[in-house]
Every structure is written in C-alpha cells, then in structure tokens.
Amino acid sequence: MAQNNSDGVEGASPAKRRRLDQVTYSEICADFRSGSFSDFFMEKYNFAQVASYKMQPDDDWTDMIAQHAKIELDPTKEYVILSTVFIQSNCYIIGHGAKIVIVGEPGIAFKVLTKSFGPVITNMWAVSFTDCVFQRRDSYNGKVFTCASQVLFHNCFFVGFTGTCITSTAALTVRGCQFLACYRPIMFLAAFDLTVKHCVFDKCVIAISTEGDFEISSNLCTDSCCFLSAAGTGIFSYNSIVNPFTLQDSAEFSMVTCADAKVQLLHTIHIHSNPKLVYPQFMHNVLLRAKLFVGRRRGGFHPHFCSLKYSLLTLAKGSERKVNLSTCYPDGLKVYKVLNRNPNRLFTRLCECDASHQTADIVLGEVGLPATADPTLDSVDCLEFSSDEEW
C-alpha cells in the first residue's frame, strides 16, 4: 500500500502534496553563487518551480523584481508608478488584468537595462509582462518602456499614451497586445529581430517603426495614420489594415518621414528606400482604404495574395519596374509614381523623428497597374490561386 508523505509522490493526499513553486528566487540566486551550478548555462530550475510573490501597491517595483523575479499583481488593486522602475535581470510579471497607472513628470516608467550575471531558469529567459493594463494619468507624456535587453509582452493593453510605449534596442516580442489611442506603440532601433503577432492597433499615429529585421503577422490596424514604417526588411503577412476615411479625407492629416534621407509623406505602410536591402515578404494581407509606399531596393516587390481595396500605391523613383501585382486583388487601387518636386509650394509637417521638416510638394503621376496579367489570356482558375487540396 502506498505510503502518504508530503513530497507530492504517489499516494500522498491532495492536501499534503507540495506545489512545484517552492523555491524562491533568492534561494536560486544563493544556489547559483555557491557554485552548485556546474555551468552557467545549466538550467537547474524551471519556471513552475519558482515561487511567485504577490505584490502590494506600496511595494518598491525595482526591489521586488530584483528579489523575487516572479511577480503576481492583484487585479482588484491599482498600481501607481511614480518613478522609474529599473530591471536588470530576467523576470516574469503576471498582471491578472491589474491596472498599472503611470503618473509624474515626463520620463521613462520602466527601464530594462543590460542583464546582470545570474542564474538561467527554463521558460524565464527574458523580461516578460503578461496580462497587464498600462494607463497614464496627470498628462504624463513620457515613454513607458525602454529596453536594452530581450523583452516579451503577452496579452497586455496600452491605452492613451501620447509618447512611445515601447522603445527597444534588443530583441523584442509583442504578442496578443492591444494599443488604443497611443502615439507610437512600438519603436524598434535594433539590428535584432522584432516579432509582432496577433495584436490590435486602434487610433494610433505610428503603430510600428522599425530599423531592424521584423516578422509582423496576423495583426489588425484600424483608424491609424501609419501602421508600419520599415527601414529594415522581414516578413509582413496576414495583417488587416482598415481606414474608415476615404483617401481625400485622410489627406487632411499627414506626417512626413526622413528615414531614407529624403522627406516623404508618411504612408500607412511605408517601405523606405535602401539599395543594400531586399524588399520584405508581403503576403496574405488585406488593405482597405490604405496607402502603401514602395521605395527603391534590391530585387522585386511581389505581394502574394493581398487584397488592396480602394487603396493608394506610391512608387519611388526607380521602383516602378520592380513591382508585380499579378497575384493580388487590386479592386479600386490607384497607382502613382514620384515624378519630381515643386519648389514653389512648400509646407511643414511633423516628422516621425519627432521634429518638423519643411519640404516641397511632391508631383505624382498616375500609372497603370504594374505587371498584371492579361485577363483575356491568363485564367484565374489555375494552380496559382488555388490550394493543394483543390488539385
């Protein structure tokens, strides 16, 4: 007959079974400093074993994260950030839907620094925030996060920030998050990878601005000035961009960009010119009343199975022969190419670099749909527009 014990082995009663999270982060750090880890990269502990600390609103964020690493927030309480929170080690913040309110002078609410030397815990490889709601108060217009180490945001909600929500110079992953009425949700300044999946951007000015490689997939952007300003390259797939205004109405509010050393009007999706980079992979996207700018790069720009309904495509000089729309659905699409500038008509606009630039009016010329098939010769009832199961 199995013998009852308190170690959670077979035969123990449910009341006496031990939970996995019985090791505190302080004990793990002490074990690491004692030299019992045979190797720095040895993952002796996993996420489920680390005891979580239920944080109180009056606790010091910097100290609690350094001491406990695995933090739980109370959804019935409100957590107010009055000064910058410094994070220098891997941690895991479980929000449970709790509100984190940022007040005070403009600055940085959370500053993720370069990680210090410490233990490696399985499934706690980065700074992670999950199920947190971030709000601002008292006209706070600073940044929410600046990240110098890898950070993961999972199912978080940012609302009403007039500054940049997340600025990163390291690998960044944003999954299942929502950004409502934010000026710039994501600004990626690293040469690493940016991953944004299953997110919602509503009523934002510049949703994603990236200088590095990216994978942006399965997102929804509505009523925003710019969804993606891409100076780098990567994968852009399965996204939906919906603008409730017509192209004439959206022209009343416009911004510019100087990312490619030329001041251009900022489009909903803006692929900057760079002769050293290839075009991003552009697949299975739906654009409704959106603006797409295609700069000059290496190779060709061939959107696959994208719906470009009542949208505007602007081609930079030298890129008009690089675009192929033969596998798209361009109903109501208008295509223009940049001809020259009118020096007699100058205007000043706010730039995505947060400065204001004066530029000459750009003269555009309307062109036909580039590289589309002849409907009298090429049938759409073919393998190109079908799945494997249909053949």
Curated annotation (Swiss-Prot):
Record localization: Host nucleus; Host cytoplasm
Keywords for this protein: Early protein, Host cytoplasm, Host nucleus, Host-virus interaction, Modulation of host cell apoptosis by virus, Phosphoprotein
Cellular component, GO annotation: host cell cytoplasm; host cell nucleus
UniProt modified residues of type Phosphoserine: S387
GO BP annotations listed: symbiont-mediated perturbation of host apoptosis; symbiont-mediated perturbation of host ubiquitin-like protein modification
Keyword Oxidoreductase set for record: no
InterPro entries: Adeno_E1B_55kDa, Pectin_lyas_fold, Pectin_lyase_fold/virulence
Any one GO molecular function term: ubiquitin-like ligase-substrate adaptor activity
SUPFAM superfamilies linked to this entry: Pectin lyase-like
Domain of life from the UniProt record: Viruses
Predominant localisation class: host cell
Keyword field contains NAD: no
Comment field on protein domains: Contains a PML interaction motif that allows the subnuclear PML localization.
Biological role: Plays a major role to prevent cellular inhibition of viral genome replication. Assembles an SCF-like E3 ubiquitin ligase complex based on the cellular proteins ELOB, ELOC, CUL5 and RBX1, in cooperation with viral E4orf6. This viral RING-type ligase ubiquitinates cellular substrates and targets them to proteasomal degradation: TP53/p53, LIG4, MRE11-RAD50-NBS1 (MRN) complex, ITGA3, DAXX and BLM. E1B-55K probably acts as the substrate-specific adapter of the SCF-like E3 ubiquitin ligase complex.
Similarity comment: family membership: Belongs to the adenoviridae E1B 55 kDa protein family.
Subunit structure comment from the entry: Interacts with host PML-4 and PML-5; this interaction promotes efficient subnuclear targeting of E1B-55K to PML nuclear bodies. Interacts with E4-ORF3 protein. Interacts with E4-ORF6 protein.
Protein name listed in UniProt: E1B 55 kDa protein
Species whose genome carries this gene: Tree shrew adenovirus serotype 1
